Each structure stands twice: as C-alpha cells, then as structure tokens.
Amino acid sequence: MSRRKQRRPQQLISDCEGPSASENGDASEEDHPQVCAKCCAQFSDPTEFLAHQNSCCTDPPVMVIIGGQENPSNSSASSAPRPEGHSRSQVMDTEHSNPPDSGSSGAPDPTWGPERRGEESSGQFLVAATGTAAGGGGGLILASPKLGATPLPPESTPAPPPPPPPPPPPGVGSGHLNIPLILEELRVLQQRQIHQMQMTEQICRQVLLLGSLGQTVGAPASPSELPGTGAASSTKPLLPLFSPIKPAQTGKTLASSSSSSSSSGAEPPKQAFFHLYHPLGSQHPFSVGGVGRSHKPTPAPSPALPGSTDQLIASPHLAFPGTTGLLAAQCLGAARGLEAAASPGLLKPKNGSGELGYGEVISSLEKPGGRHKCRFCAKVFGSDSALQIHLRSHTGERPYKCNVCGNRFTTRGNLKVHFHRHREKYPHVQMNPHPVPEHLDYVITSSGLPYGMSVPPEKAEEEAGTPGGGVERKPLVASTTALSATESLTLLSTGTSTAVAPGLPTFNKFVLMKAVEPKSKADENTPPGSEGSAIAGVADSGSATRMQLSKLVTSLPSWALLTNHLKSTGSFPFPYVLEPLGASPSETSKLQQLVEKIDRQGAVAVASTASGAPTTSAPAPSSSASGPNQCVICLRVLSCPRALRLHYGQHGGERPFKCKVCGRAFSTRGNLRAHFVGHKTSPAARAQNSCPICQKKFTNAVTLQQHVRMHLGGQIPNGGSALSEGGGAAQENSSEQSTASGPGSFPQPQSQQPSPEEEMSEEEEEDEEEEEDVTDEDSLAGRGSESGGEKAISVRGDSEEVSGAEEEVATSVAAPTTVKEMDSNEKAPQHTLPPPPPPPDNLDHPQPMEQGTSDVSGAMEEEAKLEGTSSPMAALTQEGEGTSTPLVEELNLPEAMKKDPGESSGRKACEVCGQSFPTQTALEEHQKTHPKDGPLFTCVFCRQGFLDRATLKKHMLLAHHQVPPFAPHGPQNIATLSLVPGCSSSIPSPGLSPFPRKDDPTMP
C-alpha cells in the first residue's frame, strides 16, 4: 500500500520521540526534512533547501484553516505527558504557521517532519510548468488543496493567525481535553475521506475517458528536465492535477491561473465533471489534455497554452491496456450520447485546428467495434445507413416524396410500396427515387406544380370525384372562423385589405387558410344551403377576421401540409382549398358518404330502368376508379366481393357471426373460430353449470340462465330430463337464436352460402384483417391453459355445443369434434353420461327443437356437398363414419348414441385403443403404430412420447398451445392438423411425413 493510502504512517514515531526530542533540543536535521514556507516543498538536505529558498519567489498558495491552534514552541517546550490525540492536534496546528527554516531555528520542531511527510505523500500533487508560462525562467511546483484545506489566492491570503492560547495548566487533567481533540480529529478524518473519494472519482473518470480512446502515451518529461526542481523532487511521484481553471483564463500566466483556480475550487462537483463538458482539444490547463492528444503530432509549446505537451505527466491510466476502449465506450456511451444531443455544436471538429474535438470523441464512441450507436437513444446499428434511417425517427425528416400525391416517407422502400397505389391510375408516371428537400415544397415551378410533383393535385381529385369513380367529395363548408379567414384572403388578393398584412407572399395565403381549417372544418354532411347563411354571417364579423389574420401571419404552419387538395367552388382567389395530410374525415362522415353514393347509384339505376336501359344488379360500393375490390372508406383492397361486403360490415359495426354457446357476436369468422376453440378447450366448465330442473349441463352461466327462463316460460317441459343431449342443445340454441340475437347479428340464410372459391378468398381476407377484436379471443388463451390437465371429454358434451352452431363454426371444429367422438367411443365406459332416452320420448319433443335440429343438419350437409372431398370435414366424415352416415346424424340423433363403435356399417375397431376404422386396411395400418408393449402417444410437434392420451393433451395445451388433433392415421391426419390454429400440414419436425412411421407412431 502506498504512503498516501496510509493513515499517518509516522504518527507513532512522532508520539514516542516528540517529547524527548523537544526536551533535549538536539534532534538531527536529517531525520526531519525541511519545508519551504512559500511553496511547501520539503527537502532532506539543508544545502538544497537553502538553494531552493534563494530561487523560490512564490507565496504559499495553500492556507490551512483549522481553529484551536497551539504554539509549536510552547507545545514542544512542554514536558508534561500528552495523549495521542493532543499530539495529533498539534501536528495539524503547526501547518497553519510558517514552518521553521534553517535560518531561524537550529533544529526544527520534532512534530513537523514526520507529519509533514505524511501530508505531502497524501495531499501534494506536483505539476511541471512551462518556463514561458510564468513569463520568465524558473520552475514552479504547485500543491493541490490539502486534505481539509481550502486554496486561496495570494492576494487574498489572510494575515498569520494569532498565537494560540497557552496550554492549560498542569493541574488540569488530560481527560478534560480529550473530547474536543477527538472531535477535531474526527472532523479532519472526515474531510480527508471526502477528499480521497473525490480524487478517486476523478481518477476513475479520467481513466475511462482516456482508455476509451485507446491511446498510448509517450514517456513523460523527466524530473531533471523541470527547471528549478531539486534532486529531491525526483523521488516524489508526479500525479495529475485536476485544476478547475476555466479555458477563458488560459491566456494569463500560470501564477494567475493558479490564483484564479481558487475561485472555483470550492465547487468540487464542477471540478470533477469539468473534463466531460469541455473539448479535449480546447485550451485546457490540466495536464491530461496533452495526454489525450498525444496520438497526433505534438504542437510547439505556446505561452498561451499552459496545458501543452511539455506538461505530460505519468498518471495511473498508463497501466491500463488499450483494450479498455470498448469497455469505456459501453460504460459512457449512453451518457455522452445524451450530452452530444444536448450540445450539437460539439459534434463538429474544431475549426481547422487539427486537434481532436469532443465531437470526435463522440463519433468514436458511436462506433465501438464497427457498430453505430444513436446519440439520442443509444441504440446500436450494424451500418451507417441503418443509423441514418433511424435518426430520421428522432428528427422527423422524411426525404422521399411521392410525385403524385405529395406524401413524404422516411425510406425509399416505403415510397415504393406506396407508389403501387398510383400504378393503375397513372401508369405513365415514374416514381422519383431521389430525396426531395422539404424546403422545396414552398416553391411553385413554372408549370404551376409544386416542386417534385408530376401530376396536378386537382387532376387526381377530379378522377376521384367522377360519376362511378369513388366518393364524390363535396366542397368543404368551413365554420365561421374558417370562412372568416377565407373571406379575408379574398380581400387580400383584391388589395382591399392590404393594410392588414402588407407584402404577404402568395403562398402564405394557402398557409393562412390551413392555419384554421384543421380545427374549424365543418362536417361534410353540412347541407349546401347552409353555406350561404354562413357566409352572410361572416360579413358581420370583419373586425374579428382582421384580428384573426394578424395572429395567423405571426404563426404560419409548414407548407408541407398543403400538398393534398380539395376542389373549390370558385369563390376563392386560388384554384383549390388545401387539406392537411393528417386531417381526415370522421368515420361517421365516411359512412354518410358511402350511403349517399349508394343512394345515387340506386337513383341512376332506377332512371335507367325507366328509360328502358338494361338494369344492373345491386350497386357495390367499389368502383373501377377505386379498384375492383377497394374500400372507398379506408382505400383497402380486398380479395373478393364477399370479403369487401364483410369489410363494409365491419365499418358499420356489424357482428354477424354469433357464438351459439355463449351468445357473443363477432365481426369475422376467424374471431368466432378462435373464440369457439376456447369453449372446446375448457371441459372443466361443463361440470359446473347444470340446470336445476332437468340436470342438463351447460358451458357457461349465460346459456344456463336462458335455459332456465325457457323452463319457466313453458317453452321446455319440466320433464326435460328425458330429452336427448343433442336434441336439448339444438332446442336451446334455436330458442337462443330467437331470443338473444342482437341487432348486429345477421346469420346467413342457407340459400346464401358462399361458394368454395369465395370461402377460400374470405379466409385470405381474414388473414389480412388488422382490426381484430382481441378481447374476443381471451377465452382461447385463458381457458386453454386452465384445462391443460383435464381428461378427454366424451362426444356427448361436444355435440351439445356443436349441434346448434352455425355452419361456419361447424366447419372449423368438425375435425376436432369427429376425433373427440372417436375418442369417446373408446373411453365411453369411463365417463359418466346421462342414460340415453328411449326412442318414443324423442317423438314428444317440441317442434322448435326438431326444426332447429333439421336446420343445422341441413346446413352442415349443404356445406359438405359444396366443399366436396376437398373439405377436411367431408374427408373425416367419409372416413370416420362411412359415406352413408352423415356427421350430424352421428352427433345429434339418439339412434347414433346407441350404436356401438364396431357396429356401424362394417367398421373395424382397434383392440388396443378402441378406435374404429371403415376398412380393414386402415385398421392394419393403424395397428402398426402401436408398440408391442402397449400404446404410446407421441406429440406431433416435438416427437415426445406419452403413455396415455390425457398426458399428451396436457402437454400439447401447455407446451404448444394447440388442441390435440386426435384423428386416424393417414393422409386425413394432415388435413386434421390444418384445422388446428397455428398448425399447418407441413410440421417442421425431423423425419415427419404425412404417413406415420412404423417405429415412431404419432397418435392412435
């Protein structure tokens, strides 16, 4: 450990030898080095000390101010024994008075030497000064503020302190003085500790700063080259001095700089952070400035630069290798990036000085190891181009401009994607791939178009407003405030109100118009007759208009907002009224426009019919000008007319897809499917809700309440326990459809079922749908995880839910339902089911139940016929039940519940797992999947095997969030997997093929 880190290393010797030396008065001078009273330099050789006194001409820059000093002579002359604290107090007191020199005393005070050595090793910092800085020859050794000391300028140095009071009489006990001395010692130790912490912080910051640059420092100037320093100075380690001198004071001499440093020496925080807020290449007085620039050519020493290269000093950072640059950049990159953002002027190099400015430090930190870091948010990018694109998100710069509509984009790729919208309308216009400065949007070219535009804005509006060419835009009818500005602009153009805004440029009229339009634009549904009354009311508010214009002239918005235009009625002095890019009509206005356009098209159709022209079908909202299947409200292009109709229903808030289990309605079939899977994966809820009258089980409480109301209303007889599960569910669902269908629910009739082509295109549209109702899918995530460990349920509970659902829901869940039916056939004895009712009771069912059952059955049969064998439902139906037995009949009819799995029309049952197959070949292929020691169930996603199906279900629900698709092996298994959300037919697992391997079965 160095002497600076020790706590008073010579204190014990001072306490032991002090009294004897002072009593004898013959202490040797070589044991106690002599200290200069002016510069506080200490020497062990008296000859060197005398030579230094002759050359030293500087007043002491440091004055230690501690109260309660004692006279060194009196304390040394005292022969009474003193405690250790008292001796240390005298050591601190002697520092206030001038130390004895060789001329005034034959032997210095015994307490001065050892203590002074400890103080010098812990507090003194030597700096080599240039000879030219002081204006002449002679070296200078400065001392940093002592521990617990305050540096003062020479002119403000106070007079020597008054002599301390004499020591107490011998009669007073030493215990009376222990308490104040101990407190004084504690205060000194505290100040010393604070000073050491400050110095440690400064050293760490300097090491990180210089280590981040990855530079190596040359050999420092040897002590022998420093003029005016003796041989004793070579034994002292030279440490860097962290001077708080400001750069504005560097033109003065070093003596004046040291004196001015005392003004800011009382602010250690600013001193510690000084080098972080000033460029390294600036005229900075502290010695590390030269170290930071040592990798560049060394400039000649200058009188105005006290921090030049002859102040190179050995510092602790020399021991650190150059590899600390990346670590330091990672530690300080974010903080300095924020500093660079706060002071952008520092990002540039110095004015041709060839020195490293602070901006260069930042640029080197932005690219640690070839990476590029954002100076605003400290994100790191792999290339400079990516960093520049990212910086545009902070600056708001959008350099790429569409030359058709004037919209701006941050990247060229976004502009390319946007420009595809204009390809159909403007095939002859080429996209401008080059950046267009935003300030050029203010310029109107000789052709009358804004700079960077290839198509007049009004031309695009005319095409959009032609009959059958999209929504016809009405001229904006602004409110009183906006019309006041418009009328005033008319006065400005005619010169009648030039006194309001004299010399106003032409384009500023457009700017003034848009300054009030975004917040005062009236709804497009305003009747045309109200425009004249509004203008008449404006004529009475001329003074308010002029006051408003005077405010608008002082706050003009950007001209970039004036590139999207609307047609005007001609009453304005300019050809069109501008509309900002961000401003758009409300959804209510868009719907009103759509209704008006449909009414106009209907009126045209009626007129053509009256005149004998051939009639057309019901007008579609889309048009040729806006694309074959483009929404005129949000300009979205859809895949087919059916998808467009569903899309318009979403704009209108329609929810035609209704869940028959809980009654919730959804806007898309995809949302309904996702919601219904939540019902399928929550078997625990089925045992919780049962009817108290007929003991029928339901999925949720809402359906149970409706069922109980039907019991109380007489719609269901109290002997409903004799009803079959399938029939009861159908009756419940049919009654629920009549009682709980809301105004936004429109189930499609059977005659309007979509074709397979439209169904596929509609599913594509559902994949593109962005406005998903996330809350509708909460049951999929929540209930799926709750029922992970539950056993497989029987088909009776599943058919209770599916029997009354629409054909859309039945299509989506047909495969899981069929598989669960096969599963239940195997484990039917293990589940508690109500006894199947006898056939005569089925004849007593009310008519609504039979009608609902027949409707659903017919709908599902119709869907199966339309889709043919391409439908997974049809494939599974043919394989699972035979071509002569429909799926609905197997699910809902009571006779199907009585059938044994092996009794249905030649079906073959597996002896191991109990599944039935239509042919012997399929059964043999299935039996190959069973190992010899028993059934093994394998996950199709991760190929993990399980001994029972329940464990596999839990694994697939928890690990893969999928519904286990238990289907017979073969090509239809892949079709079943395609119905599972998130599962495709091509599962990326090693060695998985559509047909299961013999040695690696998938599932029974």
Curated annotation (Swiss-Prot):
It holds the Pfam family zf-C2H2_6. Disruption phenotype: No overt phenotypic abnormalities. Histologic analysis of the eyes reveales a colobomatous phenotype, with delayed apposition of the optic fissure margins and persistence of an anterior retinal coloboma phenotype after birth. Deficient embryos display correct posterior closure toward the optic nerve head, and upon contact of the fissure margins, dissolution of the basal lamina occurs and PAX2, known to be critical for this process, is expressed normally. Anterior closure is disrupted with the fissure margins failing to meet, or in some cases misaligning leading to a retinal lesion. A zinc finger (C2H2-type) spans 34-56, 372-394, 400-422, 629-651, 657-679, 689-711, 908-930, 937-961. Residues 71-81, 99-110, 810-819 have a biased composition (Low complexity). Residues 151-171, 832-841 have a biased composition (Pro residues). Residues 756-779, 800-809 have a biased composition (Acidic residues). Residues 731-742 have a biased composition (Polar residues). Belongs to the sal C2H2-type zinc-finger protein family. Probable transcription factor that plays a role in eye development before, during, and after optic fissure closure. This is Sal-like protein 2. It comes from Mus musculus (Mouse). The gene is Sall2.
